[in-house]
Amino acid sequence: MDVPFYFRRNAEPGEPTPIGGFYTQEDIKEMVSYAADRQIEIIPEIDMPAHSNAALAAYPQLVCPVVNCYIGVVPGLGGSNSGVIYCAGKDTVFTFLQDVLDEVMAIFPSRYIHLGGDEAQKGYWKKCPLCQERMKKEHLANEEDLQGYFMKRMSDYVRSKGREVIGWDELTNSSFLPEGVIIQGWRGFGAAALKAAEKGHQFIMTPARIMYLIRYQGPQWFEPQTYFGNNTLKDVYDYEPVQADWKPEYASLLMGVQASMWTEFCNKPEDVDYLVFPRLAALAEVAWTQPAHKDWTSFLKGLDAYNEHLTAKGIVYARSMYNIQHTVTPNDGILEVELECIRPDMEIHYTTDGSEPTATSPLYERKVPVKETLTLKSATFAQGRQMGKTLILPVRWNLATAKPVLGINPAEKLLTNGIRGSLKYSDFEWCSWADNDSVSFTIDLLKPEMLNTLTLGCITNNGMAIHKPASVKVEVSDDNSNFREAAMQSFTPEEIFREGNFIENLPLKLGGTQGRYVRVSAKGPGVCPASHVRSGQASRIFFDEVMLE
């Protein structure tokens, strides 16, 4: 895809269908042979009943008869088609999938065939007369058991061909599991797979929080755009799949670990290499090193040589391990800047006058206090040579900066830390709320101030259903009890649900009112509309800074 995830739209009737390319059977045979020569076995995954938009766009007769929407393909989450899956009530669906699997098994000699089984929304199955009739005929209690039937039927077919089956941990949602199926645990740090282990099934750990390589692998200010928060090289290295509270028999059923790289979040092959390397080396350490023998410092020394090998091979890899993660926290009227690097063998040097840091600049040894507008720059060094990118932190002071925020959300302290967020909503500079319908926080200015304008920094990321609020209200008080409204602004759905990824300021005129306490209340925009790439899902609000003048 040449369109970033946050710009992707739902497919509409009449639009030209994008052709993303395909592999011939000869291409696949060549790849299988190439991998086998290097002692690698390629395991194909044919997703069912969900994550199947491409097949269903080509063969719409395989969906439930109650589906009345246009079936298009939006890579990733499926857009408005995310709930369109194979119909479990049509025998033609199973015949089609058996034919597909016959072709797949003919060109992939792997011992295992992966059948997917994850993230299947059952809304259409609940309405479909064919699916409901299937449930009655097979004496199935609910739609989860209908998926269990679906997966068992296809699993039995694969096993009849002498292969073994792998499936995602949603298969454990059913009251029964296909015989011999191997479960991949991705939800709840992989814990969902333990439900299968309880029944004696083997499993593979691939927890999304640790082993999904689409996450940022370093301080996000330096990283190309991806999704879902941080997952650093050290996060991967520190992961231990065998947990102390496991039953003894679980460990013997654990087959190994897997890192997952979902390429629909990438725009070119180099993006994939960048996200995979060098975290792949950390994954290998997790798989083959006993916990007592793991040593982060020793691993880094070996990794330096490994990275030289990648360079010689022309492989684009991330040097994120050398970059600095910052934390700026209000504390008693000042800001404290904390700088960290995951490599303990790096020195951090910094400046506060806007100049570029060098190996002779002040050495970072403790939190740096900031009391005014300035630009702090820092970088990592080893043996006098700069190793990472320069972190540039523009601190901008206003009446709210370093003032306490009176609320129940710990992240609200970010709203007065003088630092603006980036286009990455998970960069640790954006504040979000669990309940977007009733966002409210109060800033204590510590003394009465004349207030002319309050500006809220707000981010839109259409692909992640992040939008500005439906309304914002500002109230002012002298005693934190009796508040008077100072400003109110509302936005239309057209203004709210815009496409793209961008930051905007929401200014509210306060007209010179005076007060010590400033309360900001925001109402969430609600559910994403039908035309949205995440239609039907709840939208979210993210603010980075409150600026009071």
Give short role names for the model-derived ranges:
Residues 1-37, 54-95, 123-143:
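Aromatic- and acidic-residue-enriched carbohydrate-binding clefts of CAZyme catalytic domains
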Residues 424-487, 502-549:
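Aromatic, loop-rich ligand-recognition surfaces of beta-strand-rich domains
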Residues 485-496:
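Solvent-exposed serine/threonine-rich low-complexity stretches and specific carbohydrate-binding patches
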Residues 290, 294, 300-440, 459, ...:
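Short, compositionally stereotyped local motifs that mark structural "simplifiers"
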Residues 46-54, 116-121, 169-171, 209:
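Short, solvent-exposed turn/loop segments enriched in Gly/Ser/Thr/Pro and often Arg
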Residues 77, 81-180, 187-195:
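Active-site neighborhood of glycoside hydrolase catalytic domains
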Residues 164-170, 175-181, 186-336:
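Flexible, acidic glycine-rich loops studded with aromatic residues
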